[in-house]
């Protein structure tokens, strides 16, 4: 099993080019199921989850081609297999995103209940409830969702909770439904907007993108298009926190500043000097960080996917920070590993109290999920001595060449 070996204590400095957003690319790849024409997707990151999704789509009959420039062509002229098996779904929760488009286009789907990161139940009941409202017949047997419908019908759907993948699944399904679908309490995340913009480019009729009420007028068919995936706001935030925690200076290229207000506000509150343009961000940390309180919530509030990284920043900050996690119930699993590195953290329910210490100590630590693995890498970068991060397959699910990008900033990090 691969691991990362890090010699800490280096001030990071330099330029980083941000990759395409995994959480936008995955549903956009699934959108290829909605048309028999070719969908060309640019800026697709090279990640394990992307590879798994492409393998799954190929198994369903989608022809794919990936070139050296991270451009992916997908043609779903004929869907030969309407099953997403457990063996492929268990490592990636996003595989549930084939359910809506496959059902809308082919009239049937059999999808395994999802796996992925162990950071909460993340139930799919909102997906099922919405599709049933659109006329689908759904049964769950032996760990699989069995769905069928001659043609989906438009419906008024009020989601009980804000769910990103639920919004995406229902939005894709509604593009080919008969009539108008209204999604209330819809997710507003930029990745949802990116998918919607791709669907619109394919001929979908969607209004309210970026609001909590999305209206989709179904059409008979969608067509192919060229689309470029948005930059990854979580990768952007991770590198900004890495630079801030190390007292460094960083310049992000090919990013999207307008998607990062909550993260940038907290970094400035911590003492970072930040300048930015439409597609670039410059951060410089002149003084030790100040502690910042966080409360995760759906976009545009502070993202849960940045909670663990900011916890690392708070471990060495001046003062005490209170971090409240409202999205997932098990997203403090990295705390135990940070405590092995001399962090002072107390957890009670969905709240963590982080008291800043003079410095972290290198240690052997183990990643438990994608963002926790990133936080442990950041901790190793600022710790005294050597840190070994095990189970980094989690990291490879969401960060493209992270050790290469960090090395270019001066980090002493290698894969073993």
Swiss-Prot record:
It catalyses: phosphoenolpyruvate + UDP-N-acetyl-alpha-D-glucosamine = UDP-N-acetyl-3-O-(1-carboxyvinyl)-alpha-D-glucosamine + phosphate. The keyword Cytoplasm applies. Its EC number is 2.5.1.7. It is an enzyme of class 2 (transferase). GO terms for molecular function: UDP-N-acetylglucosamine 1-carboxyvinyltransferase activity. The modification 2-(S-cysteinyl)pyruvic acid O-phosphothioketal is found at residue 117. One of its GO terms (cellular component) is cytoplasm. Keywords: Cell cycle, Cell division, Cell shape, Cell wall biogenesis/degradation, Cytoplasm, Peptidoglycan synthesis, Pyruvate, Transferase. InterPro entries: Enolpyruvate_Tfrase_dom, Enolpyruvate_Tfrase_sf, MurA_subfamily, RNA3'P_cycl/enolpyr_Trfase_a/b, UDP_GlcNAc_COvinyl_MurA. Its main location: cytoplasm. The active site is at 117 (proton donor). Pfam families: EPSP_synthase. UDP-N-acetyl-alpha-D-glucosamine binds at residues 93, 122-126, 305, 327. Pathway: Cell wall biogenesis; peptidoglycan biosynthesis. GO terms for biological process: cell division; cell wall organization; peptidoglycan biosynthetic process; regulation of cell shape; UDP-N-acetylgalactosamine biosynthetic process. The keyword Transferase applies. Cell wall formation. Adds enolpyruvyl to UDP-N-acetylglucosamine. Belongs to the EPSP synthase family. MurA subfamily. This is UDP-N-acetylglucosamine 1-carboxyvinyltransferase. It comes from Nitrosospira multiformis (strain ATCC 25196 / NCIMB 11849 / C 71). The gene is murA.
């Amino acid at each position: 099993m691969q691991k990362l070996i890090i010699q800490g204590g280096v001030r990071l400095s330099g330029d980083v080019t941000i990759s395409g957003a995994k959480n936008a690319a995955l549903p956009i790849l699934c959108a290829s199921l909605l048309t028999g024409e070719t969908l060309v997707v640019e800026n697709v990151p090279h990640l394990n989850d992307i590879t798994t999704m492409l393998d799954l789509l190929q198994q369903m009959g989608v022809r794919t081609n990936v070139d050296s420039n991270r451009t992916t062509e997908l043609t779903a002229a004929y869907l030969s297999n309407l099953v997403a098996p457990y063996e492929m779904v268990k490592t990636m929760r996003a595989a549930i995103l084939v359910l809506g488009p496959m059902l809308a286009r082919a009239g049937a789907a059999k999808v395994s209940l999802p796996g992925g990161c162990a950071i909460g139940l993340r139930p799919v009941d909102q997906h099922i409830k919405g599709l049933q409202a659109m006329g689908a017949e759904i049964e769950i047997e032996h760990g699989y969702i069995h769905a069928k419908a001659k043609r989906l019908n438009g419906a008024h759907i009020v989601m009980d909770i804000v769910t990103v993948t639920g919004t995406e699944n229902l939005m894709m399904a509604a593009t080919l439904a008969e009539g108008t679908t209204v999604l209330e309490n819809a997710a507003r995340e930029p990745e949802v907007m990116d998918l919607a913009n791709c669907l619109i480019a394919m001929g979908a009729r969607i209004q309210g993108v970026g609001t909590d009420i999305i209206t989709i007028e179904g059409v008979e068919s969608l067509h192919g298009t060229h689309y470029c995936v948005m930059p990854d706001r979580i990768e952007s935030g991770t590198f900004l926190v890495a630079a801030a925690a190390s007292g460094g200076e960083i310049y992000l290229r090919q990013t999207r500043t307008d998607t990062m207000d909550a993260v940038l506000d907290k970094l400035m509150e911590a003492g970072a000097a930040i300048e930015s343009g439409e597609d670039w961000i410059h951060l410089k940390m002149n003084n030790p960080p100040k502690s910042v309180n966080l409360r995760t919530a759906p976009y545009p509030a502070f993202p849960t996917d940045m909670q663990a990284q900011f916890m690392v920043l708070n471990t060495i900050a001046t003062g005490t920070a209170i971090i409240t996690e409202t999205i997932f119930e098990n997203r403090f699993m990295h705390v135990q590993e940070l405590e092995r590195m001399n962090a002072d953290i107390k957890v009670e329910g969905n709240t963590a109290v982080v008291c800043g210490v003079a410095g972290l100590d290198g240690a052997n630590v183990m990643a438990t999920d994608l963002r926790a693995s990133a936080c442990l890498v950041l901790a190793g970068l600022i710790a005294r001595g050597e840190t070994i991060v095990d189970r980094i397959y989690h990291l490879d699910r969401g960060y493209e060449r992270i050790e290469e990008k960090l090395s270019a900033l001066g980090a002493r990090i290698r894969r073993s």
